[in-house]
Amino acid sequence: MCVYEKIDNPEKLKQYAVKAKPAVEKFSGKFLVRGGKNRTNDGIESPRTVIVQFPDYNTAIECYDSAEYQEAHDILKGHVVRHHQIVEGS
């Protein structure tokens, strides 16, 4: 799950998305929420939220730690403020 607090460079976000999508799909990740209309009820105002479902917790960690995903992640450095969490489902 990724909650964006600030996006300074939308073009870099697009470049990141192009690279991140195949990395996520390689680990059988399924995008459940990817941007779209949202309403903040409590906490920080967020222009974008992304939720990806993986087969299990460890696969999500493997994806995040993979060279492919980290290459995509590097594109965002200095261009966004976001809160990224890997949460085990029930």
Q: What is each model feature region?
A:
Residues 60-85:
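C-terminal structural segments of small proteins and small subunits
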Residues 1-48, 53-65, 88-90:
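Short S/T/G/P-rich N-terminal loop/turn motif that feeds into the first structured element of a domain
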